[in-house]
Amino acid sequence: MSPPTVPPMGVDGVSAYLMKKRHTHRKQRRKPTFLTRRNIVGCRIQHGWKEGNEPVEQWKGTVLEQVSVKPTLYIIKYDGKDSVYGLELHRDKRVLALEILPERVPTPRIDSRLADSLIGKAVEHVFEGEHGTKDEWKGMVLARAPVMDTWFYITYEKDPVLYMYTLLDDYKDGDLRIIPDSNYYFPTAEQEPGEVVDSLVGKQVEHAKDDGSKRTGIFIHQVVAKPSVYFIKFDDDIHIYVYGLVKTP
């Protein structure tokens, strides 16, 4: 297995706060278009992708999820791409000629007990680099992916975006090793007895970059196995970022 392809944009850190919502009042409210569209979760799709002056690429993949806090946003695993993408398939002008395919997503049998034992674990994942060298990436197995039963969500220290791999064979072959310290990667957030921590899912986030510019996004998912860890979708990026947020005194 080759190392994951690192997306072109990186993030140094996230500072999150709730942003004031702007409410617009209209005389007539039109029913959102996504309510009348076919449910495409679990479907195989293909479409063109046009980025700036670059030639059109043809992408093919599987729709994993429709984000509940932002229903126009879909989570997709594209064939041949290691990272998971978040796209507004019906709104993004870069998506050309979206087509739903008649193909079915295969559902092979899986050792559920072994699969579940990997969830929430910090791991060392070994990839084969150039000239047969071994590259070791440390990260965390976040969850089993929806729809594609043999795949897992995973993220890495070197690149905090959401990736998807079939990890069981790597684990059996010794190329995926569990790090005994479960808090190695994402420390567990301290919580007072009886304290109830509100989820940030659906809240907006602002990130200040090193150059002083800012980017905005939204928390779209809280990791069940590690509640201090969230998936973030930034407005200016198609990748899904993974960050652990720990309360500071």
Swiss-Prot record:
A Pfam cross-reference name: Spin-Ssty
Key words of the record: Cytoplasm, Nucleus
Transmembrane segments: none
Keyword Cytoplasm tagged: yes
Annotated stretches, region: Tudor-like domain 1: 41-90
Site feature (Histone H3K4me3 and H3R8me2a binding) residues: 159, 170
Subcellular location: Cytoplasm; Nucleus
Location of the region described as Histone H3K4me3 and H3R8me2a binding in the Swiss-Prot/TrEMBL record: 128, 237-239
One BP term from GO: negative regulation of cell population proliferation
GO CC annotations, alphabetized: chromatin; cytoplasm; cytosol; nucleoplasm; nucleus
An MF annotation (GO) of this entry: histone H3K4me3 reader activity
Superkingdom assignment: Eukaryota
Record region (Tudor-like domain 3): 201-246
Annotated region (Tudor-like domain 2), positions in chain: 119-168
Entry-linked PANTHER family: SPINDLIN (PTHR10405)
Functional note: Binds to acetylated and methylated histones, including H3K4me3 and H4K20me3, probably acting as a histone reader that recognizes chromatin marks and mediates downstream cellular effects. Promotes canonical WNT signaling, and is involved in the down-regulation of cell proliferation.
Disease with which this protein is associated in UniProt: Lui-Jee-Baron syndrome: An X-linked disorder characterized by prenatal onset, generalized overgrowth, extreme tall stature, enlarged liver and spleen, macrocephaly, dysmorphic features, and normal development. Hemizygous males are more severely affected than heterozygous females.
Family as reported in the entry's similarity comment: Belongs to the SPIN/STSY family.
Record's subunit section: Interacts with C11orf84/SPINDOC. Associates with chromatin.
Protein name: Spindlin-4
Gene that this sequence comes from: SPIN4
